[in-house]
Structures are given as C-alpha cells and as structure tokens.
Design a protein with these regions (language model features):
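Short glycine-rich, Thr/Ser-proximal phosphate-binding strand/loop in the N-terminal lobe
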Residues: 1, 34-37, 107-109, 118
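Active-site glycine-centered loops adjacent to acidic/histidine catalytic or metal-binding residues
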Residues: 63, 89, 244
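Glycine/GP-enriched mid-protein hinge/lid loop-to-helix segment characteristic of carbohydrate kinases
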Residues: 59, 73-174
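Adenine-nucleotide phosphate-binding core of ATP-dependent small-molecule kinases
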Residues: 1-18, 131-137, 142-213, 228-240
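Short glycine-rich anion-binding loops that position phosphate/pyrophosphate groups of nucleotides
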Residues: 25-28, 89-91, 201
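Short, hydrophobic alpha-helical segments
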Residues: 10, 248-256
C-alpha cells in the first residue's frame, strides 16, 4: 500500500524524506492537507489527514492541478507564466496557472473546465447537473450514449473515423468543434500564453489537433494578432506524482 511504499523510500533514501506530495481526484481542503471532497470514489478518504498517517509533512492536490504543476515545472508549460492545462480522458478536468502560480480559487476547485455548458438546450447533463457540458461532449464516459450505443470507447470512435465512416466523422468533428469553442472561450477570458492538452484522447494526434486548431482560429479573439499556443502535454501516467512533488516543494519553499 501507500504507507509501505513511503516507508520503503525512507529506508533506501540516503537522506530523510521531509515532505510528501499526494495527488488524487476530488478537491483538497484550504490548507492542502487532505481531500475534502471526493464524489463517488474511494469512500473513507475524505478528510483523512495523511500527514498523521505518514508521520511526514504531506500536501494534497487535485490530480488535474498536479498535472499542471508537472508541466509547469518540467514539461510543456516550463517558462510560461500564464497557462491552462486540460485533461481529456474519462472526463474533462484542468488547471490554471496565473502569474506563475497555480490558481485554486475559493474552494480549491478552479479548473474544472469540463463542467462548463456549451449547449444549454442539451437534455444530457453532467454529473453536476449542467446541461450540455464539455465533459459530456468529449469525455470517454459518455461516448456510448453519444453514439447511441455504437461505440464503447473514444478509441473505437477514432478507429472508425479513420475508415471514413460518415457517422464517426460527424461525431468526432462535432466533439472537437465543441472543444475548440471552449478553448477559444478560455483564451478570450484568460489570454494565456499556452494551453496544454493531456490524457488518453490526445493520443488521437493530428486527428485531434489539426481540426481543433481550425475551430480555434474561427472563434479566438486576436486583436493584436497574438496566438495562444496549443500543445500536447509531455507527461501522462506520471504527471500526478511529478506534479504533486513539485507542488509540495513549492509550498515548503514559500513557507520558509
């Protein structure tokens, strides 16, 4: 388990482990010491004080926020002050970097980009009850419903898209168009230097990024001709661990 892993690292490490960073789905509390809200997942871990469990100073961070920190410290966002990272997988999440700092907001929930509405007339709702959410339009969890049972995963959709299937092409491009509208809207509000996309859906490669850039060109406000970069994340599976460690280091340094 996690404690055994930490104790093993303490044993083999030449120096004492002074801080631990932990990423998880859900929302951290105001001091980033525990998971305050973890809907429908890992019951029993809400408000669990990890520092007492590990007997080591521990900082907890949302997994999408951790992915942002990983990219900001070591990856595609390194060197940028204002950026947005969006995770595209089972659902849609994200994180926001403002003036070089992770923006968490009032309830540590900033960046839940999937829960914006892009079609208020849509009967389908997100897990928060939001009609026409971006998460429903793009998330892997909804693909079976969006395709009327034809596709079990986004991977199947993309595979059929490559076979020039008309329905698959319409469904995929409609989803990408909605993502493009959303990204253009974020650009118009935040004016970031770069937006980084991560998660399994980005494995579509050019089938995602080429039409996405076309749609963003249609909707982004560019009064000075400056264009926000759209790039793929450098890290995938390890982004949570890397970002949580970076966040813990930043919190420790800022408290000195």
């Amino acid at each position: 388990n996690v404690l055994e892993m930490v104790n093993y690292l303490k044993k083999i490490h030449q120096k004492p482990i002074e801080i631990i960073g932990l990423s998880a789905p859900g929302l951290a509390n105001e001091t980033n010491s525990c998971i305050a809200h973890l809907p429908n997942r890992l019951h029993g871990l809400e408000n669990f004080i990890w520092e007492q469990y590990f007997e080591t100073k521990t900082f907890v961070i949302n997994d999408a926020h951790a992915a942002l920190m990983a990219e900001a410290k070591f990856g595609a966002i390194k060197g940028y002050k204002n950026a947005i990272l969006i995770t595209l997988g089972t659902g849609v999440g994200g994180g926001i970097l403002i003036n070089g700092e992770l923006y968490q907001g009032l309830s540590q929930m900033a960046g839940h980009i999937g829960h914006i509405s892009i079609s208020h007339n849509d009967d389908e709702r997100s897990i928060l009850g939001i009609p026409g959410s971006l998460e429903y339009a793009l998330g892997n969890y909804s693909i079976e419903r969006r395709s009327a049972g034809r596709f079990k995963s986004t991977y199947e959709l993309i595979k059929t898209f490559k076979e020039n299937d008309p329905f698959a092409q319409w469904l995929w491009l409609d989803s990408v168009r909605k993502l493009g509208i959303s990204l253009a809207s974020f650009i118009n509000v935040f004016s970031p230097e770069i937006i980084v996309l991560s998660g399994g859906i980005t494995l579509a490669g050019d089938l995602l990024f080429e039409p996405l850039n076309v749609f963003i060109d249609m909707y982004e406000f560019r009064p000075k001709g400056k264009i926000t970069k759209i790039e793929k994340a450098h890290f995938d599976d390890l982004s949570g661990a890397i970002g949580a460690a970076a966040f813990a280091m930043n919190k420790t340094i800022s408290s000195i």
